[in-house]
Swiss-Prot record:
Binding site for NAD(+): 271-285
Function: NAD-binding protein involved in the addition of a carboxymethylaminomethyl (cmnm) group at the wobble position (U34) of certain tRNAs, forming tRNA-cmnm(5)s(2)U34.
GO CC, one annotated term: cytosol
InterPro entries, per database record: FAD/NAD-bd_sf, GIDA_C_N, MnmG, MnmG-rel, MnmG-rel_CS, MnmG_C, MnmG_C_subdom, MnmG_C_subdom_sf
Pfam families named in the record: GIDA, GIDA_C_1st, SAM_GIDA_C
Protein name as annotated: tRNA uridine 5-carboxymethylaminomethyl modification enzyme MnmG
Keywords from the named record: Cytoplasm, FAD, Flavoprotein, NAD, tRNA processing
Electron transport listed as a keyword: no
Keyword Flavoprotein on entry: yes
Primary location recorded for the protein, binned into one broad class: cytoplasm
Protein residues bound to FAD: G12, G13, G14, H15, A16, G17
Length: 625
């Protein structure tokens, strides 16, 4: 019997499930990962890439918490690039194309090497619920696995339905059956469900592409890893092809637009705004004479090519026709047609910031089930849900990511307070404090928190504390070195002759002075500082003026996040609150004052009233203790 008893059970072995299971096990919870097949753990169902704008920040944050995605991407990455590298550090996004096979095998190896983590092959059919709390998972073969905390990471499998033209196939992804039982379970629990859609392009045979006739894009000269624990990238790097659709392409698609599952009315679900199908592009941006297509090889020893930019749900024969009108693809052979897939999701406002279902203790949701799109968004939620599931299993306080200190916190707050009307994707523009939430400082922001929670390996603790000490020592050195304007001029630094002494740290905040320039002024002092620390301090100093201005706003936000509202708070009993707000707050059930403040119609007076009542409640609880 003890073989079927766990602290945490994770359902689903995709990007959310892998991170959730790993996170729970790292906290010492005896964890089970349920998946249909062991060899599908870590499968990249759509594009063969990790990271990007906003998404790369999430990967770095997952890594800072000792998660898996960054390290696995460093093993499998075959074209590392830093996006927006000519812009400010706050909006730069690390990205890599990935070898699908290498990524899957590296993720499986990482999961198998994790202590306290068992992989169970099978089909989770229902939840075991006792006295309003999760008690385990009921399998399709009638086995019952016991656990006080369960994480659902079902991806596109909840009543998944694939569309290729008018053809409809129940599936979670190509060749894999959907999950019907769990969708019925969620509906039975009274959770608000919706229907969303995503899509993928046809896969092409790289041997049939005319690579000589199209543009090429290669990796950066300097390969920058995702993980703090990766010293160098050793996997061979490759180029991808770049081409464009043509007027002939557009004509075929427009002539057949009503045969697309999206435009025939066959699909109910809403698709991702920022990853549109080629049909959507032509309907919404019909004035353009072409749309860029990136031809991304799916592996070092795989001839399959992913044509990024032409996701579609047109019939297979129409896909074949329009693909042949794209330069370089005139003779391309389709290995698998593109398709749209629609699936059920849960309104994420049903969740607390720990990603626990408000009305069912012990049930956590992560990934596309919460209305997001993308591997990185799913993995970040999996990390949060896995940590909190482990904490729930031991009756410990939950761990909440703040939107002031992480993109993970921004995403979870957006989801749980605002909900979704379309698949949610992370962008740097979603963060109010993005100048301080940079990809380059994810470790400094989050690893100390991870160390306090206890989900970090000894090896990472040693490496991070050494790096942190080096940063602090070098920062203090920069702040101790100072020059007058005349001394600076003699050293070749052109600053105002105002008689004011400036430290090396002050000078580093000027846009026209680099660490290398200051090293010429103080070669003996600064010449020995390594490039990684030098770059970190250069970026930090450059943003220091702006970050000082933001400090007050961040403190206010953190204070409001810390003022929690009981989930059973009786808004109807709050005299002075309008009936409209009583209804809206009762429906939204905000977790804290920060979430209450963004409820539609909320006023400063209503917030003040709520705060007064919460203080009275807190005082009464203290007096009765």
């Amino acid at each position: 019997m003890t073989d079927n008893v766990f602290d945490v059970i994770v359902i689903g072995g995709g990007h959310a499930g892998s991170e959730a299971a790993s996170a729970a096990a790292r906290l010492g919870a005896k964890t089970a990962l349920i998946t249909h097949r062991r060899d599908t753990i870590g499968v990249m169902s759509c594009n063969p890439a990790i990271g990007g704008l906003g998404k790369g920040h999430l990967v770095r944050e997952i890594d800072a918490m000792d998660g898996l995605m960054g390290r696995v991407a460093d093993v499998a990455g075959i074209q590392f690039r830093m996006l927006n590298k000519k812009k400010g550090a706050a909006v730069r996004g690390p990205r890599t194309q990935a070898d699908r096979k290498l990524y899957r095998l590296a993720m499986l190896a990482a999961i198998e090497a994790t202590p306290d983590l068992d992989i169970i092959e099978g089909d989770a059919f229902d939840l075991d619920v006792v006295d309003g709390c999760v008690a385990g998972v009921i399998m399709k073969d009638d086995r019952t696995l016991k656990a006080p905390a369960v994480v659902l990471t079902t991806g596109t499998f909840l009543r998944g339905l694939i569309h290729i033209g008018s053809e409809k196939t129940p599936a979670g992804r190509v060749g894999e059956a959907p999950s019907i039982g769990l969708s019925a379970t969620l509906a039975r629990l009274g959770l608000r469900l919706g229907r969303l859609k995503t899509g993928t392009p046809a896969r092409l045979d790289g041997k049939t592409i005319d690579w000589q006739s199209i543009g090429r894009q290669g990796a950066d000269e300097e390969l920058i890893p995702f993980s703090f624990m990766t010293d160098t990238i050793t996997t061979r790097q490759i180029e991808c092809g770049v081409t464009r659709t043509t007027e002939a392409t557009h004509r075929i698609i427009v002539d057949n637009i009503m045969r697309s599952a999206m435009y025939s009315g066959q699909i109910e679900g809403v698709g991702p705004r920022y990853c549109p199908s080629i049909e959507d592009k032509l309907v919404k941006f019909g004035e353009r004479d072409g749309h860029q297509v990136f031809l991304e090889p799916e592996g070092l020893d795989d001839d399959t090519v992913y044509p990024n930019g032409i996701s579609t749900s047109l019939p297979a024969e129409v896909q074949a026709d329009f693909i042949k009108t794209i330069p370089g693809l005139e003779a391309a052979r389709i290995l698998q047609p593109g398709y749209a897939i629609e699936y059920d999701h849960v309104d994420p406002r049903e969740l607390t910031p720990s990603l626990e279902v408000k009305r069912l203790r012990g049930l956590f949701l992560a990934g596309q089930i919460n209305g997001t799109t993308g591997y990185e968004e799913a993995a970040a939620q999996g990390l949060a849900a896995g940590l909190n599931a482990a904490l729930r299993s031991s009756d410990s306080d939950p761990f909440h990511f703040s939107r002031t200190s992480s993109y993970i916190g921004v995403m979870i707050d957006d989801l749980t307070s605002r909900g979704v009307t379309e698949p949610y994707r992370m962008f740097t523009s979603r963060a109010e404090y993005r100048l301080s939430l940079r990809a380059d400082n994810a470790d400094m922001r989050l690893t100390p928190l991870a160390m306090r929670v206890g989900c970090v390996s000894d090896a990472r603790v040693r490496r991070f504390t050494s790096y942190q000490a080096e940063i602090e020592t070098c920062r203090a050195l920069l702040q101790s070195l100072a020059v007058t304007p005349n001394e600076a001029r003699r050293a070749g630094l052109n600053i105002n002759l105002d008689g004011q002494r400036r430290t090396a740290y002050d000078l580093l905040s000027y846009p026209n002075y680099s660490f290398a320039a200051l090293s010429d002024v103080w070669p003996e002092k600064l010449g020995m500082i390594g490039p990684k620390v030098a770059e970190a301090l250069e970026i930090e100093a450059g943003y220091s003026v702006y970050l000082d201005r933001q400090a007050s706003a961040i403190a206010d936000q953190q204070r409001d996040e810390e003022r929690q509202i009981p989930l059973d708070f009786n808004y109807d009993a709050l005299a002075g609150l309008s009936n409209e707000l009583k209804v809206k707050l009762g429906t939204a059930r905000p977790f804290n004052i920060a979430q209450a403040a963004i409820v539609e119609g909320m006023t400063p007076a209503a917030i003040a009233l709520l705060l007064v009542h919460l203080r009275r409640l807190s005082s009464a609880e203290r007096n009765s203790a």
